[in-house]
Curated annotation (Swiss-Prot):
<keyword id="KW-1003">Cell membrane</keyword>
<keyword id="KW-0472">Membrane</keyword>
<dbReference type="GO" id="GO:0005886">
    <property type="term" value="C:plasma membrane"/>
</dbReference>
<comment type="similarity">
    <text>Belongs to the UPF0161 family.</text>
</comment>
<protein>
    <recommendedName>
        <fullName>Putative membrane protein insertion efficiency factor</fullName>
    </recommendedName>
</protein>
<dbReference type="Pfam" id="PF01809">
    <property type="entry name" value="YidD"/>
</dbReference>
<dbReference type="InterPro" id="IPR002696">
    <property type="entry name" value="Membr_insert_effic_factor_YidD"/>
</dbReference>
<comment type="function">
    <text>Could be involved in insertion of integral membrane proteins into the membrane.</text>
</comment>
Length: 83
């Protein structure tokens, strides 16, 4: 129940707020998609993972693939393409 509510909040952001701003996410998947995937995979801990991801997404950060890891982590998972 809580997962569905949190995901609905992110989807509302995607639909009504995100279109008001230019594309700016430096990662794939986007931060909002990452948040949804993290919540689906890790429940409430996924919210913390999503917030950590948003804090990593700024002009001075690296770009590239940053998938949701299978384990709880607040750090970016490096992929072979990042090297």
């Amino acid at each position: 129940m809580m997962k569905k509510f949190l995901i609905a909040l992110v989807k509302a952001y995607q639909r009504w707020i995100s279109p008001l701003f230019p594309l700016s996410c430096r990662f794939c998947p986007t931060c909002s998609v990452y948040m949804i995937q993290a919540i689906e995979k890790h429940g409430l801990k996924g919210v913390l993972m999503g917030i950590a991801r948003i804090l990593r997404c700024h002009p001075l950060s690296e770009t590239g693939d940053d998938p949701v890891p299978d384990y709880f982590s607040l750090k970016r998972k490096k992929t072979p393409l990042d090297n």
